[in-house]
Amino acid sequence: MSEAASSTSADVTALLVRWSQGDANALDALMGLLYDECRAIAARQMRRERPGHTLDPTSLVHELYLRLIDQRHATWENRAQFFGIAARMMRRILVDHARAKRRAKRGGSPTLVSLGAASEEPAAARTGDVLAIDDALERLAAIDQDQVRIIELRFFAGLTVEETAHVLGRSPRTVKREWRLAKAWLFRELQEQSS
């Protein structure tokens, strides 16, 4: 890790600690420091959404900020944990948005969601259904919560295997193995759900 990256990690950790201790300005400083990275995560998640989605990456980051305001009392450890939680919150925002749209339509047919079984990242089709993925992840959580965390960190937050291993306190080898199993399980679930 370069000195600049290390310094930024230290800055992020310090801001997270200040924020959790009640410093209201720390969240603003944190978002200023991490806005571009949060927006990149949001853009990655929005690429998986249907064309014409009413949210855009900027709106998603702004919604994230509003939800983070309520998370001040969480125990924040480091930059990687922050991005894991931010990615999970963005996913929840998209799920809530999709559910609200579906309720407004009074129904709607689910869309086929495909995951690239051979790819490193289980990329939901750009026209994928965030609700189908969320439902599948909830079923997986009942079986193996660790695999859900790995999917959240790798797929939604875009963390590397090494970063994911660090956040979870596991070896990269274990994370790779669990990542493969989780992708295969999710792929199978989404295939069954679409048939």
What feature does the model see in each segment?
Residues 1-195:
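Intrinsic, short, N-terminal disordered tails of RNA polymerase sigma-factor systems
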